[in-house]
UniProtKB/Swiss-Prot annotation:
The entry's keywords: Isomerase, Metal-binding, NAD, NADP, Nucleotide-binding, Potassium
Catalytic activity: (6R)-NADHX = (6S)-NADHX; (6R)-NADPHX = (6S)-NADPHX
GO molecular function: metal ion binding; NAD(P)HX epimerase activity; nucleotide binding
One of the Pfam families matching this protein, by short name: YjeF_N
Biological classification of the source: Bacteria, Bacillati, Bacillota, Tissierellia, Tissierellales
Domain YjeF N-terminal: 9-207
UniProt-annotated binding residues for (6S)-NADPHX: N55, N56, G57, G58, D59, G126, T127, G128, L129, K130, R131, D132, Y137, D155
Gene: nnrE
Cofactor annotation: K(+)
HAMAP family: NADHX_epimerase
PROSITE patterns according to UniProt: YJEF_N
Binding site for K(+): N56, D122, S158
Name of the protein in its database record: NAD(P)H-hydrate epimerase
EC numbers on record: 5.1.99.6
Known function: Catalyzes the epimerization of the S- and R-forms of NAD(P)HX, a damaged form of NAD(P)H that is a result of enzymatic or heat-dependent hydration. This is a prerequisite for the S-specific NAD(P)H-hydrate dehydratase to allow the repair of both epimers of NAD(P)HX.
Organism of origin: Finegoldia magna (strain ATCC 29328 / DSM 20472 / WAL 2508)
Length: 214
């Protein structure tokens, strides 16, 4: 099995989008479908999606749409400022707003009421994280870990470095990790349950980057 670094995955994504011509929003829709199938086969009362405003969060918002379409209760908690959001995050955010999905921006006064019968989607940090997690982000991750809900992480458990088996101060303890297209390098030592799901990145993109790796 091939394990890739965060930088290699970034280059693979970039080549796919800018050289092959597959729009990033198409890859996000593909990711959504692959993640959602591991969620919608679970029994849960309510689903809570925790999302940053980058593309990892955009994946989470897209998954929230699938949960909504399955006629299950879903609420989205956004950590971060909308004006700093990625383009694909904003697209999915606007869709959820038009569907009247409940969205709350997290601050220090936010209260959570999550039970052991619920499911959490962790789409806060993906492969690009290289700094220690502090403040509201740390508080949210601590809350997720203290909950008894079933936790599904998107691409990487938030807080776990994707290149080295180390934690950036705190990390989500996922019951299931759905990592996208290729396993990340640190997963060679990962002890939790994870699956690797394709999102439509052509083999040509992968070979182009890995064959040119120094």
């Amino acid at each position: 099995m091939i394990y890739v670094t965060a930088e290699q995955m970034r280059q693979i994504d970039h080549y796919t989008i800018h050289e092959i011509g597959i729009p990033s929003i198409v890859l996000m829709e593909n990711a959504k479908a692959q993640i959602s199938k591991h969620i919608l086969d679970k029994n849960f009362s309510k689903a809570y999606v925790f999302a940053s405003v980058g593309n990892n969060g955009g994946d989470g918002l897209a998954v929230a749409r699938d949960i909504y379409n399955a006629k299950k209760y879903v609420k989205v908690y956004v950590i971060g400022k909308l004006e700093k959001a990625s383009t694909d995050f904003k697209i999915n955010y606007d869709i959820l707003k038009k569907l009247d999905v409940e969205i709350e921006f997290v601050d220090e006064n936010t209260k959570f009421d999550i039970t052991e019968n619920d499911l959490i989607v962790d789409s806060i940090f993906g492969t690009g994280l290289k700094r220690d997690i502090e403040g509201i982000y740390k508080g949210v991750i601590d809350m997720i870990n203290d909950s008894q809900a079933f936790v599904v992480s998107v691409d990487m458990p938030s807080g776990l470095d994707s290149d080295e088996n180390k934690i950036h101060n705190v990390a989500v303890k996922a019951d299931l990790l759905v990592t996208l297209q290729l396993p990340k390098k640190s997963l060679q030592d990962y002890e939790g349950e994870y699956v690797v799901e394709p999102i439509g990145i052509p083999e040509k993109s992968i070979k182009h980057v890995l064959n040119n790796a120094s």
